[in-house]
Amino acid sequence: MSQDYYQILGVSKTANSADLKKAYHKLAKQYHPDNAASGDTNAEKKFKEINAAYEVLKDEQKRAAYDRFGHDAFQNQQARGGAGSQGGHPFGADINDIFGDFFSDFMGGGGRRKPTSSKVRGSDLKYNLTINLEEAFHGVEKNISFSSEVKCDTCHGSGSEKGETTTTCDACGGVGATRVQQGFFMIEQTCHKCQGNGQIIKNPCKKCHGLGRYHKQRNLSVNIPAGVENGTRIRHPGEGEAGIRGGNNGDLYVDIAIKPHDIYKVDGANLHCKLPISFVNAALGGEVAVPVIEGGKVNLTIPAGTQNGDQLRLCGKGMSKIRSTIRGDMLAHVHVEVPKNLSKRQRELLEELRGESANEKENDGSFFNKMKSLWS
């Protein structure tokens, strides 16, 4: 392998522009044919190598390309193109041919591209659907209505009139872009003739104007599985907008919102509710019928001495879960109700109860201890 350009100039690969310039001027002066020692037959050759090296390394973009592909890429291309040919390029060929891959990386594929397809995938759609808690528990099928782009039923998505076909764009060769020389680089531009599609529709469909789709109001039945939670997103593949000129459809995403319930508050798979009971049931215990989310009622046992704010649990009576037979629990928060309007008999009974309570020791500190515990 011959010397690379850094070796020719006698600098490291990390040399800055000032170092390059200094090294170049020193060597150019030394090996200039007018200054070279008499009889030095290699001076002219060396001088050309120095100029070629500096020509590449002083340019940031050329230097980046040289660092990436190496010295051999230049030598090989020069051998193929012939010295001094190809329009005066210093390496015997258009430098853009040497670095086609380099341009592809930085320009989005400007080197050797294959013809592009005129098909474009349709956009995804989002639909917000509100359901009640019972529907979330049982699952439900809902009919929704929305507007979107649909596949043209006249041209079947091709964009051409019936019997017509598309042709490859002769301006870009089906690539969808043309290349324009701007100094050292070849710059890609969207083809003005096919607008980047790569195909030309000579006789566009009159219904969809060559797009292969048109706008329409749609009705769709969507299935909501049992156990969905608030904020659940359900994907319906292929139910989004139709693609352009036969491209694949997008997807439809249904976002679920659950209405607040009159009785229950949702906490994951558990349900919370307030349970009002009489002070008699709280003191003596008993059973009360409570409604459940699946419909109907179940009996809940109230232990004797239940206090206001106590929490009673009904296992397996909460929300269902998606793809599971396990349910959450229902938690009833006790609210002891004290009657405001007493009958004569009720008052008499309570007075008797108070009289019995008065016979208990009132100076044992228990009342004050309870008060203290409430404030501690």
From Swiss-Prot:
Biological role: Participates actively in the response to hyperosmotic and heat shock by preventing the aggregation of stress-denatured proteins and by disaggregating proteins, also in an autonomous, DnaK-independent fashion. Unfolded proteins bind initially to DnaJ; upon interaction with the DnaJ-bound protein, DnaK hydrolyzes its bound ATP, resulting in the formation of a stable complex. GrpE releases ADP from DnaK; ATP binding to DnaK triggers the release of the substrate protein, thus completing the reaction cycle.
Subunit structure: Homodimer.
One cellular component term from this protein's GO annotations in UniProt: cytoplasm
Cofactor: Zn(2+)
Annotated J domain residues: 4-70
GO biological process, alphabetically ordered: chaperone cofactor-dependent protein refolding; DNA replication; protein refolding; response to heat
Name of the featured protein: Chaperone protein DnaJ
CXXCXGXG motif repeats, residue ranges: 152-159, 169-176, 191-198, 205-212
Family: Belongs to the DnaJ family.
Binding site for Zn(2+) 2: C169, C172, C191, C194
Binding sites annotated in the UniProt record for Zn(2+) 1: C152, C155, C205, C208
InterPro entries: DnaJ, DnaJ_C, DnaJ_domain, DnaJ_domain_CS, HSP40/DnaJ_pept-bd, HSP_DnaJ_Cys-rich_dom, HSP_DnaJ_Cys-rich_dom_sf, J_dom_sf
Cofactor binding note of this UniProt entry: Binds 2 Zn(2+) ions per monomer.
Keywords assigned by UniProt, alphabetized: Chaperone, Cytoplasm, DNA replication, Metal-binding, Repeat, Stress response, Zinc, Zinc-finger
